[in-house]
């Protein structure tokens, strides 16, 4: 019994001891593992910091090297130019001195002989005949010596100090005037004395030539300057507080040598002190759509095209209540626009030898509503229409046409939308011509001249009418095929012209008139779009619009239309838009937008048959809208009871330079919302950020993008103010990203025989949550480089290939300042 108990005690004790040891050992092992892990983590963090530091140093070194290299290159270039100018100046001075030296030799020889003969006559009475003979012989010898010395001196001076002749001649003239006889006696001495004197002043002419060759540039202390660069067409933009400069685009192979269009748009909202301007060029519509900014801008032209284009358009509108003035002008080949509260200038379009037929710039517009802090950004490519369609925005559109293209284009567009509550109606844009009527009691627009066997059958129409009984909101929009001329302000104006090409538009005589008046708000809006040209009159009592470029055997049948409708049940917001023949597809949802373009190329899209459907349903704010645009055609339907949009064929030697414009502005009395938008045909340059903007380029190359086939989609959903809208527009390509406040734009390189099948898409998404509405949009033509953030900016270039844009050097500047809201 005892033994068994003892054994039991021992066994239990041993087991307890083992359990205790096992527990302690497990604890210690865990502690060791944790310590090892901590050491590893610390080492890893240390190594990662080292790596980051190394990469940072490398980045700084590379950045410094890049900056130094750029400065060195500029310094070398400047030194080379300066040395070349100085050398040219010295050559000119040497030539002048040689000519003067020849004249001086002849004068000195004649003078010395005359003085010697006079002295001989005086000495006749005193000297005998023998002395006379001797004196004559001596004098003759002296004169010969003097002449020889003068000649030798002149030769030596010409070789050594060719710049002293002028002063020598002056001294001789002074001696002649004084009439002193000492010149005859001391001719040798005088000639010797003149040498050192001339040598003393020999350096003065060189200093004068250097001073003449210098160039100085001085900027005033208060002068604000902003520069920006845009490729293909190149859209140079500067969008500062109040100023504006736009600017130049070099032209290539005998192109756009004379293009000089102008456009101006200004709009002001007394409540928010908001100014909005917009412009759309035919080849390019560069736009800046900030609180008060603006941008316009480019149009591509082709070989033997627009070489003499010189259209002008003026629009002026004045609203006695708000003191609003708006002017606008758009050339076909170029749409020059100035779109700032007070400033603007629009600009040039580069074109190349059979190049940039598809160039596509982008345009951005941004608007901010101080009450709701709303931001909107948008971008449209050349081939594509850059659009911004915010709470109350708009769209614009163009379609480029190419070599012998769109000769038979016959697209149509109709849009009819009716909102029983608000009685809203919007309508459309023609291909070759965009005929539009854009007012609550709107107007009819509409003619397009046709050219040498061109546009003989063009018959586009466009109507836009919108009425919002609750908010008294009115919106109009227009887009031409060749150009979309738009006026997008409560009382603003649009611009309008289209350059004409080879034996084109020589007789064009289109007219367009639109006048709208809202008795409550005293709002006037007019708009017009020509096919090759958008003829527009955009003022309460304004304007004439105007020209349409067409090409040799081009756009003979172009007839596209465009429609856009938007409904916002909560805010009673209405938006209308227009799309050109080339394609202006727009959708303007609760506050969104759509854009679209279609590039067409050599023997391309001759049979294009794209379709577009848009269906929108509003059921308890569950609104949805979709739309698509083909490359050859933009088919769109844009209404709750939507629409069909349509087709634009383009053909060989057609619409190569078509450029439409588009502008839209909408006001929401409750939220004081204003939005404008513009899209160029070849390029739509837009700036749509709180204060930033970029527009973007689309490179196109030799025989490139001939088969581009982009698509566009727009979908909008309004569910408890959760509105989303997307849109896509490729011309050759439409690259778009349109987030609530973000932006993505982007580049599309194209190469020789490249992007012939490019098919980019564009998305636009807009979200309204507690009135925090943001909309962004981007469209590249071949490429649309865009960045559209709430306040960001991206601009960007696309290099062009195959002997393209090698010399492009355009500049654009826009600056606007809003003192009240400090909006830029």
Curated annotation (Swiss-Prot):
InterPro entries for the chain: Glycophorin-bd
Subcellular location: Secreted; Cell surface; Host cytoplasm
Pfam families: GBP_repeat
Swiss-Prot/TrEMBL GBP repeat ranges: 226-275, 276-325, 326-375, 376-424, 425-474, 475-524, 525-574, 575-624, 625-674, 675-724, 725-774, 775-824
Basic and acidic residues bias spans: 117-140, 174-198, 264-276, 314-326, 364-376, 414-426, 463-475, 513-525, 563-575, 663-675, 713-725, 763-775
Region described as Disordered: 97-236, 258-291, 310-334, 358-384, 408-431, 457-482, 507-532, 559-582, 659-683, 711-733, 759-783
Stretches with biased composition (Polar residues): 200-228
Motif PEXEL motif, residue range(s) on this chain: 84-88
Coiled coil: none
Keywords: Host cytoplasm, Malaria, Merozoite, Repeat, Secreted
Complex and partners: Interacts with host glycophorin.
Notes concerning its domains: The PEXEL motif is involved in the protein translocation through the parasitophorous vacuole membrane and into the host erythrocyte cytoplasm.
Role, per record: Involved in merozoite invasion of host erythrocytes.
Entry protein name: Glycophorin-binding protein 130
């Amino acid at each position: 019994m005892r033994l068994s108990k003892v054994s039991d005690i021992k066994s239990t004790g041993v087991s307890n001891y083992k359990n205790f040891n096992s527990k302690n050992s497990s604890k210690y092992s865990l502690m060791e593992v944790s310590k090892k892990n901590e050491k590893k983590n610390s080492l890893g963090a240390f190594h990662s910091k080292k790596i980051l530091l190394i990469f940072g140093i490398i980045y700084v070194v590379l950045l410094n090297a890049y900056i130094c290299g750029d400065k060195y290159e500029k310094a070398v270039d400047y030194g080379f130019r300066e040395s070349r100018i100085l050398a040219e100046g010295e050559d000119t001075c040497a030539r002048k001195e040689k000519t003067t030296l020849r004249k001086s030799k002849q004068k000195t020889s004649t003078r010395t002989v005359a003085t010697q003969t006079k002295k001989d006559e005086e000495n006749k009475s005193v000297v005998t005949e023998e002395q006379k003979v001797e004196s004559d012989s001596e004098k003759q010898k002296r004169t010969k010596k003097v002449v020889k010395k003068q000649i030798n001196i002149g030769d030596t001076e010409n070789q050594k100090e060719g710049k002293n002749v002028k002063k020598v001649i002056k001294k001789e003239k002074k001696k002649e005037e004084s009439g002193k006889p000492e010149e005859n006696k001391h001719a040798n001495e005088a000639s010797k004395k003149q040498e050192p004197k001339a040598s003393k002043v020999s350096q003065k002419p060189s200093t004068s030539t250097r001073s003449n060759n210098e160039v100085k540039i001085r900027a005033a202390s208060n002068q604000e300057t902003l520069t920006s660069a845009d490729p293909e067409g190149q859209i140079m933009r500067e969008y500062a507080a109040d100023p504006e400069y736009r600017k130049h685009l070099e032209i290539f192979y005998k192109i756009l040598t004379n293009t000089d269009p102008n456009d101006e748009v200004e709009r002001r909202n007394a409540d928010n002190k908001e100014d909005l301007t917009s412009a759309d060029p035919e080849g390019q519509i560069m736009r800046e759509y900030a609180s008060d900014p603006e941008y316009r801008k480019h149009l591509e032209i082709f070989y033997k095209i627009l070489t003499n284009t010189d259209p002008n358009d003026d629009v002026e509108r004045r609203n006695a209540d708000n003191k609003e003035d708006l002017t606008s002008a758009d050339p076909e080949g170029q749409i020059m626009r100035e779109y700032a509260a007070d400033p603007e200038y629009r600009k040039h379009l580069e074109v190349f030898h059979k190049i940039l037929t598809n160039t596509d710039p982008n345009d951005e517009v941004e608007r901010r509503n101080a009450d709701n802090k709303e931001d909107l950004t948008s971008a449209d490519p050349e081939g594509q229409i850059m659009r911004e369609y915010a709470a109350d925005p708009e769209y614009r559109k163009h379609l480029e046409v190419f070599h012998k293209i769109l000769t038979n284009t016959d697209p149509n567009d109709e849009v009819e939308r009716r909102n029983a509550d608000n009685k809203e109606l919007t309508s459309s844009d023609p291909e070759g011509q965009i005929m539009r009527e854009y007012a609550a009691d709107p107007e009819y627009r509409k003619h397009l001249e046709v050219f040498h066997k061109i546009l003989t059958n063009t018959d586009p129409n466009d109507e836009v009418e919108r009425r919002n009984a609750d908010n008294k909101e009115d919106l109009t929009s227009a887009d031409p095929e060749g150009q979309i001329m738009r006026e997008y302000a409560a009382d603003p104006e649009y611009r309008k012209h289209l350059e004409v090409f080879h034996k084109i538009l020589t007789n064009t005589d289109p007219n367009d008139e639109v006048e709208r008046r809202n008795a409550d708000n005293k709002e006037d809006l007019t708009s017009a779009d020509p096919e090759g040209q958008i003829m527009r009159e955009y003022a309460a009592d304004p304007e004439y619009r105007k020209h349409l470029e067409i090409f040799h055997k081009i756009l003979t049948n172009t007839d596209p239309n465009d429609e856009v409708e938007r409904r916002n049940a909560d805010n009673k917001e209405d938006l209308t838009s227009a799309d050109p023949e080339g394609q202006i597809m727009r959708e303007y949802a609760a506050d969104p937008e759509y854009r679209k373009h279609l590039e067409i190329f050599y023997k391309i899209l001759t049979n294009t048959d794209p379709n577009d459907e848009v269906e929108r349903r509003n059921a308890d704010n569950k609104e949805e809208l979709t739309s698509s645009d083909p490359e050859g055609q933009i088919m769109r339907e844009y209404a709750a009871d939507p629409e069909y949009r349509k087709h634009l064929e383009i053909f060989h030697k057609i619409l190569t330079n078509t450029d439409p414009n588009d502008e839209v502005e909408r006001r929401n009395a409750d939220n004081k919302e204003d939005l404008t938008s513009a899209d160029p045909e070849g390029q739509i340059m837009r700036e749509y950020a709180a204060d930033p903007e970029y527009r973007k380029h689309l490179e196109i190359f030799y025989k490139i993008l001939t088969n581009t086939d982009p698509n566009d989609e727009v979908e909008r959903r309004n569910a408890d103010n959760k509105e989303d809208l997307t849109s896509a527009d490729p011309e050759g390509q439409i690259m778009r990203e349109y987030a609530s406040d973000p932006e993505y734009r982007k580049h599309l390189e194209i190469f020789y025989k490249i992007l012939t099948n490019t098919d980019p898409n564009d998305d636009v998404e807009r979200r309204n949550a507690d009135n925090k509405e943001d909309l962004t949009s981007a469209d590249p033509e071949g490429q649309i480089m865009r960045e559209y953030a709430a306040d960001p900016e991206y601009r960007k270039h696309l290099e062009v290939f195959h002997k393209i844009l090698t010399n492009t050097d355009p500049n654009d500047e826009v600056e606007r300042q809003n003192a009240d809201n400090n909006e830029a």
